[in-house]
């Protein structure tokens, strides 16, 4: 990473799918400048595991897990009785998930450009449902959430799955979906039409502030998953 120094200012959007060594200081400053100037950001799946000691990054991603995080990473953030809960400072891990399984996602804001026209509830293909996430960021819009069922070793809470983050004038879309396995056959979550469509819509919104993509006919329903095995 020591020689990696992309020119972020050349882009409208940065998609974060990285969970490794800390970036060089120059690169971190360049990224923060991009964000503060209004560049769009997508936080994808395990990117919220990265950089536990980078305070500004953790505000940008909203919440995070794993990577050595614990109580100092901030309170647990989840839904309770239909509202965001920010004040759960109880002890425990930061980041977990039960068995990979299918689960229903519920829309938290049907008028947001990313979710407008999508079903109020839809069944996602087998994936990790992140739970027990902690953070210091400001969650703006909960786009989709899912119940982390204890029968699949979940938290028993309504967990945020897709949301936006309030951070200056940038637009940030965070999705915890999309676990990638070691082979095409082990990438069921990424084959889900719901995952693909919401990622593309979230990326367009983060880059431009609007969504022009129509909802495809093969979007999942509340009871039926929909796979695009060729990723198209």
Identify the function of each model-found stretch.
Residues 1-2, 19-23, 41, 47-51, ...:
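Solvent-exposed loop/turn segments at secondary-structure junctions
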Residues 7-14:
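Short acidic/histidine-rich motifs immediately flanking catalytic phosphotransfer sites
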Residues 21-113:
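A glycine-rich, often tryptophan-bearing local segment used as a flexible ligand/cofactor-contacting loop or short
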Residues 1-5, 29, 156-162:
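Alpha-helical scaffolding within the catalytic cores
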Residues 150-232:
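Extracellular ligand-binding/catalytic regions of CAZymes and related secreted enzymes
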